[in-house]
Amino acid sequence: MKKIIACIGTFFALVTLSTQAKNPYLLQTADRSAMEHWVDSVFETLSPKERIAQLLVITVRNSDTPQNRKTLQRLIQEQKIGGLLFDSGTAKDQANLTNYCQSLSKVPLMITLDGEWGLAMRLSDTPRFPVNMMLGAVQNDSLLYEYGRAVGKQCRRMGIHVNFAPVLDINSNPRNPVIGKRSFGESLKNVSSKAIAYAKGLESVGVMAVAKHFPGHGDTSEDSHKTLPLVPHSKERLMSTEIPPFKAYIDSGLSGIMVGHLNIPAWDATNTPSSLSPIITRELLCDSLNFEGLIFTDALKMKGASKFGNTALRAILAGNDIALNPSKPEEQLNSILSAIEQGKITQQAIDEKCKKVLRYKYVFGLANYTPIKTKNLIEDLNAPEYDALNRKLNSEAMTLL
């Protein structure tokens, strides 16, 4: 794993923010032969249903209680899901639960974090870095890269492989109830440069960055947690304003993108959320923008998507690789199995996505999984280097504000 991380760091040291590479660097850092051998060896042990389950990441409680452990045991041993997203709690509980869940899983789990400005967005006993809107005032992008590396190191210490960050939404609508301080600002150029620097910092230490909320949640007046927001703009406006930060991110060789739940009639007039729309996810993101990394939906329990039914199946059909937190995972798995039997989706399509997920698990070091060391965990997460970085970020941001 140390060799992989060293290679990643070398890649990003040699590549500027304007690089036009499309293939994600995380995969390029791996020994291709060794990776494919591990992927094939794991894949061959999986039943058709278990291959589908690798495409689900489920949100779980971050509370280390006997009752929650029983719930997690059923989820992992019966449904054999591919990954977890812990909700808010403490670092100690999450570390203990991660070790417990990994010990139960047939295939090592992908552990994800919704940490737009670091662990403290979800974990109470960790350093609290400035929110993105404040970081947008930092002129030196190399400091944002350093910040990304720091968050990445903390993620690695916590056994976290994927961070659902950075936010690439442009804060262009003062009536937007959900983006606001989560955005790096109102300037397209500034949002792109800050977010990409942060993302490169994350990936330089082997943590996948997942930019969101494609194709752009900044200019809406509704919250996709509660409804399906309308984005009323023309294709020309979207391609000139909302899309460029994502295009720059893709061209920089970064690995993950999250598709939001948005109603965008200019592209898809069927009132279908972008996360469930083949036109937006497959045709625009994959075919037009040439994104070859891992595609996650936003959480499928959100009101912007949940009312459409069979959300995991629809998400996979639309072109996503990972269905994030659909309701009733067992029913979702069976729905996809039925769709294969009915010819709505092929087993080959599922197998290709399963292998894609396994390749990233290999890059994360899960071929040689080791439990989180809980001794000195809180001290390590609150090391003096992070406090010094925090002061530097606040100082540079406040100087400009």
Language-model regions: role of each:
Residues 64-77, 143-154, 239-246, 307-312:
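Short, acidic/polar
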Residues 47, 84, 96-103, 107-109, ...:
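Second-shell residues forming the walls of enzyme active-site clefts
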Residues 20-58, 62-74, 287, 307-401:
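Preference for extracellular/luminal or secreted protein segments
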Residues 1-27:
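Bacterial Sec-dependent N-terminal signal peptides
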Residues 91-108, 139-159, 345, 350-355, ...:
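Active-site-adjacent structural elements in enzyme catalytic domains
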Residues 57-66, 133-145, 227-241, 301-305:
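Active-site mouth loops of central-metabolism enzymes
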